[in-house]
Amino acid sequence: MSGNTLGLLFSVTTFGESHGPAIGAVIDGCPPGMALSAEDIQPDLDRRKPGTSRHVTQRKEEDLVEILSGVFEGKTTGTPICLLIRNTDQRSKDYGNIVETFRPGHADYTYWHKYGIRDPRGGGRSSARLTAPVVAAGAVAKKWLREKFGVEIHGYMSQLGEIRIPFLDWNEVPNNPFFAPNAEILPELETYMDALRRDGDSVGARIEVVATGMPVGWGEPLFDRLDADIAHAMMGLNAVKGVEIGAGFHAVSQRGSEHGDELTPAGFVGNNAGGILGGISTGQDISVSLAIKPTSSIRTPRRSIDKAGEPTAVETFGRHDPCVGIRATPIAEALLALVLTDHALRHRAQCGDVAVATPAIAAKAP
């Protein structure tokens, strides 16, 4: 199976299955000399891990990360970093009824036709469980970006089902299980999710991710554009069905006089481009928006077929997120960090000595 690696100079390969003994990631290309320990990685894993509220899957995994290689005396050595997370709460018996059938909306049918074999336990390799090592690797990338360039990456939920969440305060995001930037709307979100669980149904979400403190110049035209690689990475996140950069699809209804971000000596006027022009970072905030579909595993019986092609009904049991978007924020942050780190190293390799007389203007004019 190919397609398990993200990045060129800072590459991450994940491994494992949902109900296997362990999952993990190998980072290749991390610069040497950066202080790194499990304590630098664990906080982001704790933000993503299951069982943290009644609104997510009740699978209980500690998601404790182990650094097996690439670090000596507390510093990265420049050699591959292997991160391991052991699975401890598998309940494979919950999937006995789907061995011979295909769950609607899942990868069961496509994996079976492509490989002629599939691991039905928790979705195997296609499970969102495999986002844990992505978050672990992303924490390493976040640390390097922060220390080397002052780049910070933060995300939040802007919509849960039909409920739009007005942005009020970044400080509210870590204080609730929805990663919502608005404490006033939490009771409505709680009530909404409680009713959804009672109905045995699921719902989608919209996630926003922002990178601040960006320098100018990261990105490679034409087919390795920074925005293209961001979209590529984000579409690798389970359940993502749409990615917007900056104004995104709203650009369709804008006029050029509105959409084009003017430049002044004092800074940019607007950021409809989402911090990227011609596939290269402008020095403004990079803004990304993700559309996440409803969880496919629901208790409502659904029509499907079995391996013989005969009609059947599938009712999913087990422990599942009624909205996978609730835990998606730290994953999206990690993916953005991985792409930015890769492009930072690529820029340094080819254009690190380039200097121009034109000053870099402020990301936002006063």
Swiss-Prot record:
Cofactor binding remark: Reduced FMN (FMNH(2)).
General function of this protein: This reaction introduces a second double bond into the aromatic ring system.
Similarity comment: family membership: Belongs to the chorismate synthase family.
Protein name: Chorismate synthase
A Pfam cross-reference name: Chorismate_synt
Sites where the protein binds FMN: R125, S126, S127, N238, A239, G278, K293, P294, T295, S296, S297, R319
Record keywords: Amino-acid biosynthesis, Aromatic amino acid biosynthesis, FAD, Flavoprotein, FMN, Lyase, NADP
Entries under InterPro entries matching the protein: Chorismate_synth (IPR000453), Chorismate_synth_AroC_sf (IPR035904), Chorismate_synthase_CS (IPR020541)
Superkingdom: Bacteria
Binding site for NADP(+): R48, R54
Cofactor(s) needed: FMNH2
Annotated NCBIfam families: aroC, PRK05382.1
Organism whose genome encodes this protein: Ralstonia nicotianae (strain ATCC BAA-1114 / GMI1000)
Gene3D superfamilies listed in its UniProt record: Chorismate synthase AroC
Keyword Ion transport included in the entry's annotation: no
Pathway assigned in UniProt: Metabolic intermediate biosynthesis; chorismate biosynthesis; chorismate from D-erythrose 4-phosphate and phosphoenolpyruvate: step 7/7
GO BP annotations, alphabetical order: amino acid biosynthetic process; aromatic amino acid family biosynthetic process; chorismate biosynthetic process
One Gene Ontology term, aspect cellular component: cytosol
Assembly and interaction partners: Homotetramer.
PANTHER family: CHORISMATE SYNTHASE
Catalytic reactions of this protein: 5-O-(1-carboxyvinyl)-3-phosphoshikimate = chorismate + phosphate
Alphabetized GO MF terms: chorismate synthase activity; FMN binding
